[in-house]
């Protein structure tokens, strides 16, 4: 599984435009083969700073998303007008577990919590 962490500092007066563009991109993202999920968060201390956290099955799925023409256009609009700064991190997920899905939890955690 691949995680894409996109931190963006939205330029002054551009937050509504960015959120509208992100809303327009979401249905396209959801159609990408290998897409798992996406969530968006806002910084509690810097309201202009947003984070988008996306998960994909593999790097090929990330590449399919990157290659979409509409996404390329959104990237250009963001770089040219909407973002004062951004950082993108693409990461490999080592483990994925939760309260009820415990198969990948460390053994000591499974022993202690089930």
Annotate each language-model stretch with its function.
Residues 74, 78:
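Conserved short loop/helix modules at catalytic or binding sites
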Residues 1-50, 57-67, 82-114:
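Short S/T/G/P-rich N-terminal loop/turn motif that feeds into the first structured element of a domain
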